[in-house]
C-alpha cells in the first residue's frame, strides 16, 4: 500500500505516483459518524487549506471535510454520491473523496505519519 499521511481532522492522504494526493476519511472518523447516508463532493479547482470542500451526512451527524492543504482539486470520486455506504465499507480504499495537486509539494512532510496519528487516537481515547 502507498504511504499514507493524516490530519488532526481524521482525514487520510495518499501520495500517488503522479504527484497528486488522494483524500478520504479514516476508519476512526467513519466509525464516529455511523452509517453515512449522503456525500457532497468538492468543486474542481483551487481551494485553500482549511476550507470546507465536502459534506458527509450520517444517521448521527453532519460533518464537513476540510481541504487539508492549499491546492487544486482535479478529480472527485463520482461513485460516492450514489453509494455513500462505501464510506463505511471501505474508508481507506474505494471511498476516497477527491484528488488534488498540492500548491507546495513539501507540505506533505508536515502531515501526520502513522505513528503520530496513532498517538492522536490514543490521546483522544484517554480524554
UniProtKB/Swiss-Prot annotation:
Biological process terms in GO annotation: glycine decarboxylation via glycine cleavage system
Record PROSITE patterns: BIOTINYL_LIPOYL (PS50968)
Residues bearing PTM N6-lipoyllysine: 60
Pfam families: GCV_H (PF01597)
Gene3D superfamilies: 2.40.50.100
One Gene Ontology CC term in the entry: glycine cleavage complex
Disulfide-bonded cysteines: none
Secretion signal, residue range per the UniProt entry: none
Cofactor(s) the protein requires to work: (R)-lipoate
InterPro entries: Biotin_lipoyl, GCV_H, GCV_H/Fam206, GCV_H_sub, Single_hybrid_motif
SUPFAM superfamilies: Single hybrid motif
Keywords noted in UniProt: Lipoyl
Domain (Lipoyl-binding) ranges: 20-101
Cofactor, free-text remark: Binds 1 lipoyl cofactor covalently.
Function: The glycine cleavage system catalyzes the degradation of glycine. The H protein shuttles the methylamine group of glycine from the P protein to the T protein.
Assembly mode: The glycine cleavage system is composed of four proteins: P, T, L and H.
Assigned protein family: Belongs to the GcvH family.
HAMAP family assigned to the protein according to its UniProt record, in alphabetical order: GcvH
PANTHER family per UniProt: GLYCINE CLEAVAGE SYSTEM H PROTEIN, GLYCINE CLEAVAGE SYSTEM H PROTEIN-RELATED
UniProt-recorded name of the protein: Glycine cleavage system H protein 1
Organism of this sequence: Pseudomonas aeruginosa (strain ATCC 15692 / DSM 22644 / CIP 104116 / JCM 14847 / LMG 12228 / 1C / PRS 101 / PAO1)
Amino acid at each position: 500500500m502507498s504511504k499514507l499521511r493524516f490530519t488532526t481532522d481524521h482525514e487520510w492522504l495518499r501520495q500517488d505516483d503522479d504527484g497528486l494526493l488522494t483524500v478520504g476519511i479514516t476508519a476512526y472518523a467513519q466509525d464516529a459518524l455511523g452509517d453515512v447516508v449522503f456525500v457532497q463532493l468538492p468543486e474542481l479547482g483551487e481551494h485553500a487549506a482549511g476550507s470546507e470542500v465536502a459534506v458527509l451526512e450520517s444517521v448521527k451527524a453532519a460533518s464537513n471535510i476540510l481541504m487539508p492543504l492549499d491546492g487544486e482539486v482535479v478529480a472527485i470520486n463520482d461513485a460516492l454520491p450514489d453509494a455513500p455506504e462505501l464510506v463505511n465499507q471501505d474508508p481507506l480504499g474505494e471511498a476516497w473523496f477527491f484528488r488534488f495537486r498540492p500548491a507546495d509539494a513539501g507540505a506533505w512532510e508536515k502531515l501526520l505519519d502513522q505513528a503520530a496519528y496513532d498517538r492522536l487516537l490514543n490521546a483522544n481515547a484517554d480524554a
